[in-house]
UniProtKB/Swiss-Prot annotation:
Binding site for [4Fe-4S] cluster: C146, C150, C153
EC number, as in UniProt: 2.1.1.192
Additional information: Reaction proceeds by a ping-pong mechanism involving intermediate methylation of a conserved cysteine residue.
Organism: Bradyrhizobium sp. (strain BTAi1 / ATCC BAA-1182)
Cofactor(s) the protein requires to work: [4Fe-4S] cluster
Cofactor, free-text remark: Binds 1 [4Fe-4S] cluster. The cluster is coordinated with 3 cysteines and an exchangeable S-adenosyl-L-methionine.
GO biological process: rRNA base methylation; tRNA methylation
Name recorded for this polypeptide: Dual-specificity RNA methyltransferase RlmN
Role, per record: Specifically methylates position 2 of adenine 2503 in 23S rRNA and position 2 of adenine 37 in tRNAs. m2A2503 modification seems to play a crucial role in the proofreading step occurring at the peptidyl transferase center and thus would serve to optimize ribosomal fidelity.
Top-level division of the source organism's lineage: Bacteria
GO molecular function: 4 iron, 4 sulfur cluster binding; metal ion binding; rRNA (adenine(2503)-C2-)-methyltransferase activity; rRNA binding; tRNA (adenine(37)-C2)-methyltransferase activity; tRNA binding
Positions annotated as active site in the UniProt record: E126, C378
Protein family per UniProt: Belongs to the radical SAM superfamily. RlmN family.
Length: 403
């Protein structure tokens, strides 16, 4: 997004810090807790029940509206309460250990988290900010690694390590606001926030971490805090059918489906989850999604793979399958990564595919690849806990030079 003179610029990029410098937090963070949970923590430090509702509102304002980094900043909270909270808790975010900035302005942060095991080894996830003229989109992760093994996705080459907590998911949004100077007391052009949209399209399958994702998104969308509208939050799933309806009922955000194929035999290969929840079952769940309408269309993501799923026959069957579903189709040029077995469809073929779908009555934008040179584009995220080999780094540089 364009910035004007005199406004606070985003913080400078960070250098990667060594894994062994990580020190696990000694105290739990209040980030990610519901109001009821915050009230319980206040009770733990001796705040009388009659004061808890007021104190919760104060904490909520300072943590999620103002982005306070310590209890000392919370000037409207009594000093005794601040001291008691600081002795037991923190408002720490995930640790930012590296930041990369693409030639197109996309930013990728590598975030370090405690592992939750006795060895206290750190885990890492990635979070990506994509600035555009009329919006700023933050791509958020829900798991360390992924269990789905989608054939075209870089994250799928990393084993699932663990689910993220609600606090670690919300923490990604807070880290991004920290790095972009995007809290309520900071100037931004025309009074708008730099982060306007959230997409749960980072590492992991959100619906396999349902409770934490739900709790995090309810906090992110709360009007008295971070305040990002649910209509500006999109949850993307590869098709965990039993939790799709739950997402509509309990979270109420926009839904995106990683479809990528129109025949079960091919989708079984590209998205192995299809063997459990085939296309017909998935699309029925979409038809039943609470709140779906022409004003709240379901997005179907379709990665364009040369000679694999990009024929006009595929386009025709796609249109047929989506009949009766308020939908739009995002066509995604395949973003290569070291060791990937696929090629991106030719641009002419992508345009033909898009034109056919559009003429059938569906919006079919072609997603502009962003952040390819820093492996931040769709399907390219992978925790640096699993290092790239020298050969992979060389391949990445070669691919970036040809874009």
């Amino acid at each position: 997004m364009a910035r004007t003179a005199g406004l606070r610029e985003p913080a400078a990029p960070l250098e990667k810090t060594p894994l062994e410098t990580y020190v696990p937090p000694a105290k739990p963070s209040l980030i990610g807790l519901s109001r009821a949970e915050l009230a319980a923590r206040l009770g733990d430090v001796g705040v009388p029940e009659r004061q808890q509702k007021m104190r919760v509102q104060q904490l909520w304002h300072w943590i999620y509206f103002r982005g306070a980094r310590s209890f000392d900043e919370m000037s409207s909270v009594s000093k005794d309460t601040r001291t008691a909270l600081a002795e037991r808790f923190t408002v720490d975010r995930p640790e930012v250990v590296a930041e990369q900035i693409s030639n197109d302005g996309t930013r990728k942060w590598l975030l370090r988290l405690p592992s939750g095991d006795d060895l206290q080894k750190a885990h890492e996830v990635e979070c990506v900010y994509i600035p555009e003229t009329d919006r700023g989109t933050l791509c958020v992760s829900s798991q360390v690694g992924c269990t789905l093994n989608c054939a075209f996705c870089h994250t799928g080459t990393q084993r699932l390590v663990r689910n993220l907590t609600a606090g670690e998911i919300v923490g990604q949004v807070m880290v991004a606001r920290d790095r972009l100077n995007d809290w309520a007391d900071r100037e931004t052009p025309h009074g708008n926030r730099l982060i306007t949209n959230i997409v749960m399209m980072g590492m992991g399958e959100p619906l396999y971490n349902f409770d934490a994702v739900r709790d995090a998104l309810l906090i992110v969308s709360d009007n008295e805090g971070i305040g990002i509208s649910r209509r500006r939050i999109t949850l993307s799933t590869s098709g965990v059918v039993p939790n799709i309806k739950r997402a509509g009922e309990e979270i109420g955000v926009m839904l995106a489906i990683s479809l990528h194929a129109v025949r079960d035999e091919l989708r079984d290969e590209l998205v192995p989850l299809n063997r459990k929840y085939p296309i017909a079952e998935l699309l029925q769940a979409c038809r039943d999604y609470p709140g779906a309408s022409n004003a709240r269309r379901i997005t179907f993501e379709y990665v364009m793979l040369k000679g694999v799923n990009d024929s006009l026959d595929d386009a025709r069957l796609l249109v047929k399958l989506l009949k009766g579903i308020p939908a739009k189709i995002n066509l995604i040029p395949f973003n290569p990564w070291p060791g990937s077995a696929y090629e991106c469809s030719d641009w002419e073929q992508i345009e033909k595919f898009s034109e056919y779908v559009f003429n059938a009555g569906y919006s079919s934008p072609v997603r502009t690849p962003r952040g390819r040179d820093i492996l931040a584009a769709c399907g390219q995220l992978k925790s640096e806990t699993e290092k790239l080999s020298a050969r992979e780094r060389q391949a990445l540089r070669a691919m970036a030079m040809t874009d």
